[in-house]
Amino acid sequence: MTNLEYARMILNDTDSSNQIFTDSELQQLISQNSEIKVVPAAPKNLAKTIWQIPYRKLDSTYEAVVYDEYQTEYDATTDYDAGTATLTSAPDYPVFMECKIVHWNDVKADGLEMIATDIRRWNSYSDTGLSEQFDKASLLAYSRSIRSARGVEL
């Protein structure tokens, strides 16, 4: 599943004849809620050939790099959906993965805010029967509640 397909799925925008967001709008939401980060990985098997990071559904357009604490790179096959790296040889030191992480809750929150504040999108959302359960204020409150707490607002 591509990033755009996943974004459409979490925003309930899967009707191809009546799409609420264009591909470029969704791509912009994904890129503004993404960051390149180095995260520690934990071994997932006893042979230490499969390593897990605490993120799922990574951005597959960015080539992930796996290395140890001495910055020795390892040949690895990355599963971007599961957030795992399968190494060809077991390392002797802790492993880190440099990857592009998408904060999907923030993508969803931004998308819901765009729906609530744009009458065209709100009407399209209403046509599919998804807005009948809550009003705009509830939708905005829900988007605030799912947003990740990062950084400091000044």
Residue ranges and their predicted role:
Residues 1-104, 114, 145-154:
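Conserved short "hinge" loops at termini or chain/domain junctions
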Residues 72, 121-152:
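Charged low-complexity stretches with an acidic bias
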